[in-house]
Structure formats: structure tokens, C-alpha cells
Amino acid sequence: MRALCNELAVYLSKAFYRHIFPVTVCDIVILAIDAAEMTSAEKHRSASATAADARLLPFVKHRLGKPYRTAHLAVTERSLYIIIRLFAHDIAHTRTERTRFHIISPFVIIVTQIVLPRLTKKHFAPYNERIDNRNMTRDMPLGDLGKGEEVMKEFMLKYGCNPNQSTSKIYMKNDAELPIKILNGRPGYINFLDAFNSWQLVKELKEATGLPAAASFKHVSPAGAAVGLPLSDTLKKIYYVDDLELTPLATAYARARGADRMSSYGDFVALSDVCDKETATMLAREVSDGVIAPGYTDEALAILKTKRKGTYNVIEIDPNYVPEEVEEKDLFGITFSQSRNNAQITEALFENRPTANKDLPEEARRDLLIALITLKYTQSNSVCYAKDGQAIGIGAGQQSRVHCTRLAGNKADIWWLRQHPQVLALPFKDSIRRPDRDNTIDVYISDDYMDVLAEGVWQQFFTEKPEPLTREEKKHWIQTLSGVSLGSDAFFPFGDNIERAHRSGVTYIAQAGGSIRDDNVIETCDKYGIAMAFTGLRLFHH
């Protein structure tokens, strides 16, 4: 039986990748077992039989006994999966598996290649209604998903973090409706982790600053976060938006994406406000997995639906949704329960300033808010450098605090070096695309610059060979960076963090405090005239 299931699964995955619900061998084998259990479900109410009965039995009773030649009336992306279930039922109930497979296999080929493209809603409305009544969200076709009209209490995913984790879904434990609509695409497990974390981040940024906010997420940590402050001509150029009209929301995303373009490649985007045409236009030309926002204008949605050949993930979230106070997480079969992190990050956290310099101007307080709110949704340990309304360097998920400070500082240095006149003037060939330019610039400003400047190599990228940036030139340029704000998700245990932060222009710091070496940290701040606030608030996130 497994060989037969594998043959059908391989065919479907090759023929209809990205066009139907992804079918795995495991799916079909499990469904075959479920179907076999159905025959005894009334007598033996096992948990698996009950689950199979609840989801499949009504439709199977309707379909069983009818010749396959009439089954095409039920064919959609949704009901194709039902047909596969019926095929699994046949396998489970016949001893002539090979014969039956040769009967059904051509049928699947015919209906998917010939019948399916020609059907309209009127052909399968009765079947869809039955399936809708069973809340079979897993079988919802992409077309219906695109309308955002379905009531969803659960959403079945292709797989979990990895393809071998085949059983995966999102759902509400209290049987409530999910606070989202899938307007386009089919987001995956990690997409949703990014979406829900990043949405909280931008929502809080908007509440804290009163400005439109955006975040660029990768692997459940932000690569960038920002609010919608105007851009200088230099920033417009290095963010590749100097040819676009920019609204405050579009500017916020330009900043979030531009902070660390190497890490933001293939990001998931969060927007605090309704996505407008200008922001959608910017999104459409970047390599990105999806976006979450409280709404989309008609023009914006039309633009986004054309991205990635129509598969771009577009999620609309209810801006008024408030989760329960207690959250749970399962690990190794053990459930963890805790109160949600409802800590409010406001300027009141900056009142305790133990350093000699106690001056925190308005711009610094704003940037410190951005840094701390960003850290609240960054995998710990984490440190964030911020300037001019945006994160410019985020160090995430490091076991060592000083390594975190170095990582984030190096990213801030790269952000600043990209604004060096010599980098701005790099003579790229017109054919070199943005991702390749980003990669080339990243190497050019590193110590490995000869990887793109060697003879026979530079000709691939440039119209003429650029002069390298020397180590001294880079050091001198970085020394011109100033007014940077730094946040940490916990206390700094040693003054070495301050030493490293100072080299990247840090003038203002907000950290929890509470280290037994706080005096050493304060002394190092005073050495460089840095103003530091003890917030008394730890922001670990796991």
C-alpha cells in the first residue's frame, strides 16, 4: 500500500506543485488508515476513528457507491484532496490494490489536467457547501482563500518547522475564530511565527511613537524595525527607493528593510497601518515571503496578488484582537504556561539615569523606545542599535552578551559604511540586480574585498575597477557616526560592552541594570560621556 501511495504522491507533487494542497506520502497513508477505521467507527469509537468520522464520514457516505465518471463534479483544489482520501479508502478496502490503482490513477490525471481548469463555481458549489459546513479549512482552495471571506477556526499547514514535521496547523484553543484572513497565498509555520511576532512589534511601535511602523522579520527575529520618518537622499539611494513616491508607511518599511538588507532577503513584513499602494509597490520588487497588516487598499492588494506568480502571502489581522492573558507552549510533551509579556515600554523607563551625563534628548528617547520594543520580540540574548527612527543593527540569539553587542555593532557599522561616498559611487553594471549589489557591497566593505575586486572577478559587477576602502579609511568613516542609541534585553555584565558600543557611535543606552558590576559599566559610560538609563526591565524572548 505504501508503494502505491508513494506513486500517487510523487505524481501529484511533480504535476501540481504550488497549485494544489501539497500531498505527502504520510498524508495518504494516514488517510488510508483513517478510512479503514471508518468501517468500524460506529462499533469502536477510538480517538482516531472519531476524528476521521467527524471530518470525512459525511462526505464519504455521499460519494461511496457512485461511479468515478461522475466524481469530476466535485473536483476543485479542495475536493481533489477528498478524491485522494477516497483513493486511500479504496486501497484500505481492496485486495486488488494494483488493479484498482491503475483504474484511479488515469482518472486523477484526467480530472487534474483537463477537468479542473474548466470548472466554475457552479459545478461544485453543493460539494463546497458540505465541506464548508464541516469547517474543513485544510481543503480550502487558494481561490477562496484569496477572498478572505471564510470563517477559520483552524488553518492546516504544509508542514511544521521542517518537512518531516508533517502534522501542523494553527488554531484557537477556545474554539474561537482565528483573528486573521488569508487574502493570498498559503503561509507556512515559520511565516506565521514571523507574522504574529512582527505584528506585535509594529503595533507597539505605533502606540509608543504615534508614527506608522514596519518590521522586517527572518526566522522569528527582526532584521529591521522602524517608524515613518523622512529619508535623506543618501538613505533613499542605499535603500533603492530614490525613484519611488513614499508615504510615511512606505518610508517605515524602506527603513526596516534597508537596515540590514542581507538579513532581510526573503523577509516577512509587518505593517502597523493599512497597506497603501506606495508600500505595496515597494514590497512588490523586493524578495519577500509575505506581509501582515490590519488592512490593504484595493490597489495595494491587487499589486501584492501579482507577486511571486500570485503566491505571495498576504495576511490581514484584526487590529482589535487581544490574546488571552495566559499563554502556553508545549515542549517535549510538557506544557509551559505563563502570563503574557504585557510590559509597557514607555519613556518612564528612562527616569533612572546613574551616569554623569543624564541628558536624553527627544530623538534619543524615541530611538531607545524603538530599540527596546524591537528587543521585546527578538530572540535572546539581544542588543539593538537605533538611530533616526530605525534599528540599524540587531544582534539576536547569542549566548554571550558581548558577542551580541559586537554582532549588532558590526551591522551598524555596515549600515554606516554603505553611506560612504566611495560606496555610493561604485560603478555597478546596469544588469546587476539589487540582491547582487547588496552581496557585492557587503564583501567590498569587508576585509575580503578582493573577492569582488580580483582580476577576472570585478568585471562581473562593475564597469570599471573600484579602488578598495582601506582599513584606515573605514575606521575613520565609522568614527564619524554619532548619536546612536543602544538597548539591551538584560543588564550588561561588564564594561567591555560599552567599549564596543562606543566604537559604533553609541551616545545613549537603556538597559535593565542589576549586575554586580554595574559600577564598572557606569564608570565606562562616564569615560565616554554616554548617558545611560537603568530600566529595571528584562526583555528575554524565547
Task: Put a short name on every predicted segment.
Residues 15-17, 25, 51, 66, ...:
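Intrinsic low-complexity, disordered N-terminal segments enriched in polar/charged/small residues
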Residues 32-42, 64:
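Residue-level detector of structural "landmarks"
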Residues 20, 24, 28, 81-83, ...:
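Short, positively charged and aromatic/hydrophobic N-terminal segments
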Residues 40-53, 89, 94, 525:
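Short alpha-helix boundary/capping segments
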Residues 223-261, 392-491:
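Glycine- and Gly-Pro-enriched alpha-helical subdomains that act as flexible
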Residues 271, 287-306, 310-313, 321, ...:
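C-terminal binding/interaction regions
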Residues 136-349, 364-382:
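Active-site loops and adjacent core secondary-structure elements that bind or stabilize anionic groups
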Residues 208-216, 314-317, 380-387, 417-428, ...:
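Flexible, glycine/charged-enriched surface loops at secondary-structure junctions
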